[in-house]
Amino acid sequence: MGKEVFLLDDQGIKRALTRIAHEIIEKNKGAKDIILVGIRTRGVPLAKRLAQRIDQIEGEIVPVGMLDITLYRDDLTKDENDPIVHGSSIDSEINDKIVILVDDVLYTGRTARAALDALVDLGRPKMVQLAVLIDRGHRELPIRADYVGKNVPTSKEEIVRVSLMEIDKKDSVMLEGSKNVV
């Protein structure tokens, strides 16, 4: 069994999100026409935090929605019990808007692909971008994040564990099962 390696604490997460917020504003020449959409579960509080940072920096309130990709996943089988669907909630019109999908960890790209499929069912954005707190590599699909808090090279056996105050009562990112020190 490998070690548990500490990657980010609450201040590290805060700095990463602040940097991503600045990058979003810079790339999109402001915050106009942007909608942040968090992928359930941990993408939602991250999207809300990003919206707060953008408002602090730019003085513009960015709408935040949540996307449930459960029925769009390609790893659900007919043999599984009924999946729990929480539903999506995007109160703003996404047509002709810049939608930034927000998630905690980018790994194979399959979650991002499912989110794109779910998003297209809700409308036709002008552009879709992807923001992630952690990019751990090992893509199985041609997907990359536009905004990354931290790149963490991992083995496929390792697990990146993101804990957020809103869900887990603490902010941290840990690498579990590591044989090396990061």
Curated annotation (Swiss-Prot):
Q: Which reaction does it catalyse?
A: UMP + diphosphate = 5-phospho-alpha-D-ribose 1-diphosphate + uracil
Q: Which family does it belong to?
A: Belongs to the purine/pyrimidine phosphoribosyltransferase family. PyrR subfamily.
Q: Does the keyword Electron transport apply?
A: no
- The coding gene here is pyrR
Superkingdom classification of source: Bacteria
Q: What is its EC number?
A: 2.4.2.9
Alphabetical list of CDD domains matching this protein: PRTases_typeI (cd06223)
Q: How does it assemble?
A: Homodimer and homohexamer; in equilibrium.
Give the location of motif PRPP-binding in residue numbers: 99-111
Q: What is this protein called?
A: Bifunctional protein PyrR
Q: Which UniProt keywords apply?
A: Glycosyltransferase, RNA-binding, Transcription, Transcription regulation, Transcription termination, Transferase
Say which species the protein is native to.
Answer: Alkaliphilus metalliredigens (strain QYMF)
**Role played:** Regulates transcriptional attenuation of the pyrimidine nucleotide (pyr) operon by binding in a uridine-dependent manner to specific sites on pyr mRNA. This disrupts an antiterminator hairpin in the RNA and favors formation of a downstream transcription terminator, leading to a reduced expression of downstream genes.
Q: Does the keyword Amino-acid biosynthesis apply?
A: no
* Molecular function per GO: RNA binding; uracil phosphoribosyltransferase activity
Gene3D superfamilies per UniProt: 3.40.50.2020
GO BP, one annotated term? DNA-templated transcription termination
